Amino acid sequence: MPDLLWDDVKSLFDPDANGTLPDVVVEGTTEDWQVLLDLVQSQGWQYAYSLSGEPELPSAADMVAAASADATPELRVWPVPDVLVIFRVYQAESIDFDVDLRELQGQERLDVLVYVLRSIGKRLGKSVLMTPEGSPDHPALGFDVEADRAVLMVDPIDPGVFSDE
């Protein structure tokens, strides 16, 4: 049985209510960017790195150095065709990425998201949290490293669950 069922979480995947590009983050990752790059390559996921334009992935140190020089390196990854994950290097201390809710409709696509979150979380040994676009203090779901599974962190039926009130 899947970690998350579409019928239980589909309200969280409404782009009109929660923004098109929810934020996903792994905190405390100073040494983990290279592990992420190695994961992308070992999984055989398609990717494109947009800062240097070179077909090979740079080292994590090069990506973090570019971010420190007021650039925002962007790594676009397709774990499956038609599902894009966009990693942006803002700082070494966290791995930040976006997914497009329009691409994640239905159980099959939810399972792809859970697979990506689980793959990253297990490889890094850290939890991976997804929040509505622009609401970093309101995690909706994620991979819980201690539970070793994807978990729902809010009541998806409560329409005020993401408000700051």
Predicted regions: what is each one?
Residues 25-80:
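Short, well-structured hydrophobic secondary-structure segments
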Residues 1-7:
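Sequence termini and other peripheral, non-core segments
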Residues 23-25, 48, 74-76, 86, ...:
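Ordered hydrophobic segments in well-structured contexts
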Residues 1, 102-165:
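Acidic, proline/glycine-rich low-complexity IDRs
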